[in-house]
């Protein structure tokens, strides 16, 4: 697409939107300005291509399409069938998976589809066979009650939150924690690395239905072959949530034992983050679970979002291009440059570095909480997010860590030299930030003190760093 075409498309769109609700158009313009001027280091964020973004803004939004390709509950879905089939084809080819389901609206929806597919395969189907019933509607009230009780009495083993796991992996505040009896595995307290022997021991003791791999804040590769062996040893279904690192799998930065697709029974992902697509989810699996996953609607989902599936098809097609392999490699190289730069300047990193797209800074060495550090960095034009670290003394709200990631800045074209310079900016801000005090004189976990001159200086340096790497350079909104 030419630059003139992109600018014309977005100017026209904002003109149409602004004629109805100018405040929305102004917010869209302001968001582009903010993203252009900030060092975006949130590991779960990226920049989708103009083609991907434009694919979401069309009349597919008007169409209901409950069901699956060729088997809809509504007439007139032939064009939705086209884009869903294309998105699924690209996902299968990109990841080397026998089956792909691209309807989930988000990562948690993808996880819920996977959870219930496993429950349907492992618990519901045997119960139907025992009752000589073809469908749950054919069960007696007594059999249905017994099945519901059995479905709600299953176990899941996943990574603990403070070790880098995700809320949707069976933790009580999330619906997954109300579905499963969950137990966590953690990391070695000295190295911060996954303790695979500890995982095996926990699996033997707990005997989970699902062993769940994947993370949102673990800065190292995971050996999925070992986890599959552990799952097999206790008869568990091995599930992997690769939402954070799917782009590294697609781009062949993770291969062999570190590629989850050949090893897991079922894999879930988002389509944004390192995949650089629209906000959405997908599920990959083999033929043994495909029929159950294909029942995502009505099992978990209602109508899909056809406009987002169209954008998924575009983004997944982009990820199949040869240059995406280079992109994935540069994400990792940039993350390692950022981590090395931080450590050379005295920052403490969980696990002492990174193998993937993110690093986790222990900010207690600066005398700060994660919340204080996050806001001080934001004041200085550096966007991060606070994150718990293993055995975090400040809990999940204030935290003791800052998570930084490189997918977005890599998309903009920054390289290892710029990421080393970014490490200097981060260190400067954190070194000049101090805890604030509460009204009663006690030390605050939220308030902080940062000289505005330091924030302004670093903010200008961050802006200068980005000058040579414009975001959406072809788009001029005037």
Swiss-Prot record:
Keyword annotations: Amino-acid biosynthesis, Cytoplasm, One-carbon metabolism, Pyridoxal phosphate, Transferase
One Gene Ontology term of the molecular function aspect: pyridoxal phosphate binding
EC number: 2.1.2.1
Residue numbers carrying N6-(pyridoxal phosphate)lysine: 273
Keyword Cell membrane: no
Family annotation (Pfam families): SHMT
GO biological process: glycine biosynthetic process from serine; tetrahydrofolate interconversion
Gene3D superfamilies xref list: Aspartate Aminotransferase, domain 1, Type I PLP-dependent aspartate aminotransferase-like (Major domain)
Site (Plays an important role in substrate specificity): 272
PROSITE patterns the record matches: SHMT
The reaction(s) this protein catalyses: (6R)-5,10-methylene-5,6,7,8-tetrahydrofolate + glycine + H2O = (6S)-5,6,7,8-tetrahydrofolate + L-serine
Cofactor(s) listed: pyridoxal 5'-phosphate
GO cellular component: cytosol
Domain of life, source organism: Bacteria
Subcellular localization, as worded in the UniProt entry: Cytoplasm
Chain positions recorded as (6S)-5,6,7,8-tetrahydrofolate binding sites: 161, 165-167, 291
InterPro entries in alphabetical order: PyrdxlP-dep_Trfase (IPR015424), PyrdxlP-dep_Trfase_major (IPR015421), PyrdxlP-dep_Trfase_small (IPR015422), Ser_HO-MeTrfase (IPR001085), Ser_HO-MeTrfase-like (IPR049943), Ser_HO-MeTrfase_PLP_BS (IPR019798), SHMT-like_dom (IPR039429)
Signal peptide: none
Pathway noted in the entry: One-carbon metabolism; tetrahydrofolate interconversion; Amino-acid biosynthesis; glycine biosynthesis; glycine from L-serine: step 1/1
Family of the protein in this entry: Belongs to the SHMT family.
Annotated function: Catalyzes the reversible interconversion of serine and glycine with tetrahydrofolate (THF) serving as the one-carbon carrier. This reaction serves as the major source of one-carbon groups required for the biosynthesis of purines, thymidylate, methionine, and other important biomolecules. Also exhibits THF-independent aldolase activity toward beta-hydroxyamino acids, producing glycine and aldehydes, via a retro-aldol mechanism.
Assembly and oligomerization: Homodimer.
Record's protein name: Serine hydroxymethyltransferase
Annotated organism of origin: Salinispora tropica (strain ATCC BAA-916 / DSM 44818 / JCM 13857 / NBRC 105044 / CNB-440)
